[in-house]
Amino acid sequence: MNAPSTMTDKKPEVEHLQGENPPKDTYSAEDTATAILRKKRKPNSLVVDDATNDDNSVITLSSNTMETLQLFRGDTVVVKGKRRKDTVLIVLTDEEMEDGVARINRVVRNNLRVRLGDIVTINPCPDIKYAERISVLPLADTVEGLTGSLFDVYLKPYFVEAYRPIRKGDLFVVRGSMRQVEFKVVDVAPDEFGIVSQDTIIHWEGEPINREDEESSLAEVGYDDIGGCRRQMAQIRELVELPLRHPQLFKSIGIKPPRGILMYGPPGTGKTLMARAVANETGAFFFLINGPEIMSKMAGESESNLRKAFEEAEKNSPAIIFIDEIDSIAPKREKTNGEVERRVVSQLLTLMDGMKARSNVVVMAATNRPNSIDPALRRFGRFDREVDVGIPDPTGRLEILRIHTKNMKLADDVDLEQIAAETHGYVGSDLASLCSEAAMQQIREKMDMIDLDEDEIDAEVLDSLGVTMDNFRFALGSSNPSALRETVVEVPNVRWEDIGGLEEVKRELRETVQMPVMYAEKFLRFGVTPSKGVLFFGPPGTGKTLLAKAIANECSANFISVKGPELLSMWFGESESNVRDIFDKARAAAPCVVFLDELDSIAKARGASAGDSGGGDRVVNQLLTEMDGVNSKKNVFVIGATNRPDQIDPALMRPGRLDQLIYVPLPDEEARFSILQTQLRHTPVAEDVDLRAVAKATHGFSGADLEFVVQRAVKLAIKDSIEEDIKRENETGEAPADDVVMDEDASVSQVQRHHVEEAMKMARRSVSDAEVRRYEAYAHQLLTSRGLTGFQFDSADSNTNGPSFGNDGADDLYA
């Protein structure tokens, strides 16, 4: 019972619950949605700290805390931890402790499923009785090779020397004769907990318990094992925990509690994990139905299996029935050919309707294809609520990483926030795989110190293991989001410095793609959605594809490269479906850059091709609708590249779709010099090679043409170097290896002038002057047809209007 004085210590927000109406602005919509997650801090909620003594029956508090809780030294209390676990302990006091803290040892913490820093709740337990009979069994690995009586050496001294309350299911450790033995309380009579007295009968004989069996229950999933879906967890707890634990809430307000919840979302986001956590934390009976398992070839058996599952759950209420992969047993009836599936769907409908209103059974189902489920199941009264368990944001990913690394030994340089920021599109299972791969990489690095033939690995080696940031970097390089496994998704390794010239184009790209990803809050503050599309056009070989790769790398976005023709299919409707799939995957892995290369092959002006069945037009229509539907909340950028801009459907190039039209011209002399430097930055070049002269002589060459010149020159240098080595080897006979190293300078080790001159003889332009003129005319036409170049606001002292667009108003159709 709490002291009366503490009632005034409650926070104002808790008091609102007792008043008539809380102030309207107390909670935001987000707060209301996650209200169930807010723990109301009570005086008897204490923070766990490590015990200074190692007694399994003791909890130590400060004298102020004991006074607040009206407890005395030696009182017996019930301590509640996580996952509905509790135990009974004796209270001791320590003057030096701070208030609001409870000290318990490791064994008690394991029994309560809590860690240091977690919260436990303490309540007095004045009516605890003496136990008549208890049954304890040792854990097998702690009694191996032990001789003598367990009772005389361990149990008798443990219980005779002290006043010990115990609870059924708890573990306790006893020290004696140079070793410690761990026991489990298998049974306590007459109650679940009691105090062991002189008259208590102790049964201790029996088969020792395997630690694996014990630890499987320790590894049960709880709410603290789930990260990245705070809002969804709140929804599920509202709909499941409240009806199961407090059905009277619904009764008193006069509504029926929810019957079912459908969770949907990509694979690996934690749908099944959530259902298990809710079952463990509510203490409900958990009945798992894997979709395909209940199907049977015998007539009527599939429906019978379903009926049995529901009957079993009602007998063991409160219960949760969890149907995994529900789309396999409840597909749309009009689309299934099999009679069995139809009957199973009908049976599921009648069972969910037939559940008694307050039978304390909740049905949960999970799928990653919600639209293939029969619509009759998705109405109120069956699956009342649908919870979208989506891909986590950076904060969610950080939560998940912390959960997966809480038992890992991490080096000091590991920055989990940085990893969370870089893992766009990763779901919980991907992050678990990432942590596991990083740990494996650390083990691989230490392989030379590990002797696999030895039974025991040296303790020093085990202590030296620690996962570093480099291990995580390696794991990041070798993994990608599971949503994009079937699409070739890569964060390319092209950087801005790999692209020579094009400074103006790079600046525009940074503004369009990099800024919305890196400064999203600025766009929110100004109340605009950033543009989502860019079209590069220009002659072949000017670096359009390279630019798209570089921008995806610079803002750490995922990159999906789609070659135009590979979207087209001979089957009716397949091409549009391919376009849809690409955009769905991009939205799932946002921020993502979708790069449509050779856009003119799939987005030709509609109506131009009279011969086909309209397949090309349908693809264009699908592209248009997808680009309008690139959700403003998702950072999906579409970059198109073409060297035939006049053939692309004009509807694609309006503002709101591919609104940034960027002309990538042939490089000028300065840009050509920059490209040559970029191409040769890792190549040894003789000092007398004048790249300026090469840049001057290659007027009209594209970046690809210059790359050909460089490759040709390097190839000639390598050829000369090999010939020089062979010649020298023939002259000196079998020269020893160190002589070869000494004479290295004598061989051709650089690209020299004559190599470049020879390469220039083979050089050729890939773009003719006529083509360049055509591109420039098109770019000029776009520039002049689009801009109100003369517009200015009226100045304060002037009454004249600014220059109008076109001629005076007489010719204006809308005047």
From Swiss-Prot:
Q: Where is this region: Disordered?
A: 1-30, 794-815
An example of a Gene Ontology cellular component annotation for this protein is: mitotic spindle midzone
One Pfam entry name:
AAA_lid_3
Q: Where in the cell is it found?
A: Cytoplasm; Nucleus
Q: What class of enzyme is it?
A: hydrolase
Residues recorded as binding ATP 2, renumbered to this chain, are: G541, T542, G543, K544, T545, L546
Q: Which GO terms describe its biological process?
A: autophagosome maturation; inner nuclear membrane-associated protein degradation pathway; mitotic spindle disassembly; positive regulation of cellular response to hypoxia; proteasome-mediated ubiquitin-dependent protein catabolic process; retrograde protein transport, ER to cytosol; ribosome-associated ubiquitin-dependent protein catabolic process; SREBP signaling pathway
Catalysis: reaction(s): ATP + H2O = ADP + phosphate + H(+)
Biased composition annotated in UniProt, kind: Polar residues? 795-804
Q: Which PROSITE patterns match?
A: AAA (PS00674)
Q: What is its main location?
A: cytoplasm
Task: List compositional bias (Basic and acidic residues) regions by residue number.
Answer: 8-18
* GO molecular-function terms, A-Z: ATP binding; ATP hydrolysis activity; ATP-dependent protein disaggregase activity; polyubiquitin modification-dependent protein binding
How is this chain's activity regulated?
Answer: The first ATP-binding region has low ATPase activity. The second ATP-binding region is responsible for ATPase activity. ATP binding to the first ATP-binding region induces intrinsic activity of the second ATP-binding region. While ATP binding to the first ATP-binding region appears to prevent ATP hydrolysis by the second ATP-binding region, ADP-binding to first region promotes the coordinate and cooperative ATPase cycle of the second ATP-binding region.
* SMART domains attached to this UniProt entry: AAA, CDC48_2, CDC48_N
Going by the UniProt record, its keywords in alphabetical order are: ATP-binding, Cell cycle, Chaperone, Cytoplasm, Hydrolase, Nucleotide-binding, Nucleus, Protein transport, Repeat, Transport
**Which purpose does this protein serve, as stated in its record?**
ATP-dependent chaperone which probably uses the energy provided by ATP hydrolysis to generate mechanical force to unfold substrate proteins, disassemble protein complexes, and disaggregate protein aggregates. By recruiting and promoting the degradation of ubiquitinated proteins, plays a role in the ubiquitin fusion degradation (UFD) pathway. Has a role in the endoplasmic reticulum-associated degradation (ERAD) pathway which mediates the cytoplasmic elimination of misfolded proteins exported from the ER. Involved in spindle disassembly.
NCBIfam families the UniProt entry points to:
CDC48 (TIGR01243)
The entry's protein name is Cell division cycle protein 48
Q: What is the organism field in this record?
A: Schizosaccharomyces pombe (strain 972 / ATCC 24843) (Fission yeast)
